[in-house]
Amino acid sequence: MKLHGYFRSSAAYRVRIALNLKGLQPAHLPHHLRQGEQCAPAYLAINPQGLVPTLEDDSGTVLTQSLAIIEWLDEVHPSPPLLPKDPLRRAKVRAFALAIACDVHPVQNLKVLARLRQLGVAEEKVAEWAAWANREGLAACETLIAGEPGPFCFGDKPTIADLCLVPQLANARRFGVDVSAYPRLLKAEAAAKEMKAFADAAPDKQSDAE
């Protein structure tokens, strides 16, 4: 199994956590996003979107998009489960994960910020945009789990929600967001970071970390 990623990619970070929780050890193949290595013809032949992560299983099957990869891993390697059994709880976990993966992350990722710069947006405004996107999204996520006792986002075990939350909080801090405004999210993050699977997946622990 091979995982194509980049140490700072929050989408790849999610998948690294899932792989660690499942006890899987793929070969890690880094692609430097800031240097454009994801646009190399050889990589585009694997992932036409030119994004990370991409997972290649032992049969050569290629999977893209972090949440699709994580759900596939959860189905093929069901222990420990990353989604609750109850259909309603599953829907709530997915809604939280999608709020981050679809609504927050895409509008502040490297590709979008680079395009803003190409269009002549001042660096100060680019930074403001990224911080705004994180603040707006995390505030909504805080409300989504405000009534959940925890310690994780949904219950006493990590789910896909936690796999999305921890990397996004790292992004928010990088963009200068004061995350103390989200105590319930920080409670879930603290529980997650006590687990080796999360700690080992952190960007600064990766072979391509800068």
Language-model-detected regions and their locations in the chain:
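Substrate-binding/catalytic groove segments of enzymes
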Residues: P81, G150-P151, A199
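Terminal-tail/helix-coil boundary detector
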Residues: F198-E210
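Conserved beta-strand edge residues that scaffold enzyme active sites
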Residues: L33-R34, L186, Q206
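GST-like fold's C-terminal all-alpha helical module
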Residues: I100-E194
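GST-like domain detector, emphasizing the conserved glutathione-binding G-site
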Residues: M1-K125
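Generic structural signal for helix capping and beta-alpha/helix-loop junctions
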Residues: Y13, G36, E189, A209-E210
